Amino acid sequence: MNTQQLAKLRTIVPEMRRVRHIHFVGIGGAGMGGIAEVLANEGYQISGSDLAPNSVTQHLTALGAQIYFHHRPENVLDASVVVVSTAISADNPEIVAAREARIPVIRRAEMLAELMRYRHGIAVAGTHGKTTTTAMLSSIYAEAGLDPTFVNGGLVKAAGTHARLGSSRYLIAEADESDASFLHLQPMVAIVTNIEADHMDTYQGDFENLKQTFINFLHNLPFYGRAVMCIDDPVVRELLPRVGRHITTYGFSDDADVQIASYRQEGPQGHFTLRRQDKPLIEVTLNAPGRHNALNAAAAVAVATEEGIEDEDILRALVGFQGTGRRFDFLGNFPLAPVNGKEGSAMLVDDYGHHPTEVDATIKAARAGWPDKRIVMLFQPHRYTRTRDLYDDFANVLSQVDVLLMLDVYAAGEPPIPGADSRALCRTIRNRGKLDPILVPDSESAPEMLAQILNGEDLILVQGAGNIGKIARKLAEHKLQPQLKDEEHHG
């Protein structure tokens, strides 16, 4: 660290002057990499380990971080603190070595909490919509000249990164409930987009436990803080009397403090009116499709309005919103070989949604924006436990598309569960008589199988949270042609 950076750090976090070197185990994850980037730009020495390089590790290396693609005890011995992701087991050799050397080992949310401690923290929580809402808020604050620090779980396209160190007191961060680690955060403002049964292994399978954890998170707000909550969500509405903090509600509901009205979608843009208490109506053009994104925008507007940001800045940010990586991510429009003498093209969209509610929202946005296109989905279920727990919901939602291709379940380290795999899910959907799903044996087969069924004006949704995003990028790179298989065999 240079003298100027050290002086800045002593002003923001005086006690952290003892920390020089921060090591991240599992640094290639978006959440871990984002925090590492902010700390690197604050002047800390950053190192980390992961199993393989990716865009996150490449970006951090360019910032001066030392990245190891193995887990070894010697990687941590010079560290002041070791930050560990949820995916890392306690017997990881770097964790064992750090504990033996009496180096503090903390979770990523604890480090995020330290970044937030001396700033005006805005935490975005909820089962769905966190990443996009965080990006919208960051865009609005940047448009208003407030230069926020942000830490997001997905790529913020306008910034070209998951995280950025700003010069102001504002820190906008995605708050992760998957391991309950968001309880470490003590923000000034907290958004709750919705609450559904997901990551239930963390909550002992008890939905009441999950709901109480969200209440505990909101109780981390100071008495002068504010909770911004989606009143359209039945669970959020149920919890309102238990929050005990100042609340602003938002949604399509008539009793919302920030109400969405007259929503319509034209292609990739949503158009709607926002009614706010004691404020003029604003007519919003949002450069993101779907009613779910209108809700995300309403949450961001509620926070920005409370902060006193001008409507003109809010509206400019939303109409110019560039989106986030793998959230209805438009990868291109590609010409197809003529069918029956008619020219056609296929629109390729990559989406991270892996819960039935998220998949449903993506399908609805595609139908609303491109009603004349045939919806072709390549889907990869994520985790056997989620597939088992939400099996009927998945079968119902996936039956809405016109053509369905399905990869096997992305296990994320879980053992297979009989009856909760892709073959069973395809069979269930087929037996309902609406659709005849195509089981894709492996990722290498996907481009060729897609090419065989595309005709005319198709909209291809590549959907899921596993490694399916790599397939989407390969499809775009080769303009939907089935060259992936040969390239991978010979590359």
UniProtKB/Swiss-Prot annotation:
It holds the Pfam family Mur_ligase_C. Pathway: Cell wall biogenesis; peptidoglycan biosynthesis. One of its GO terms (biological process) is peptidoglycan biosynthetic process. Keywords: ATP-binding, Cell cycle, Cell division, Cell shape, Cell wall biogenesis/degradation, Cytoplasm, Ligase, Nucleotide-binding, Peptidoglycan synthesis. Its EC number is 6.3.2.8. Transmembrane segments: none annotated. It is an enzyme of class 6 (ligase). It catalyses: UDP-N-acetyl-alpha-D-muramate + L-alanine + ATP = UDP-N-acetyl-alpha-D-muramoyl-L-alanine + ADP + phosphate + H(+). ATP binds at G126, T127, H128, G129, K130, T131, T132. It is found in: Cytoplasm. Belongs to the MurCDEF family. This is UDP-N-acetylmuramate--L-alanine ligase. It comes from Yersinia pestis. The gene is murC.
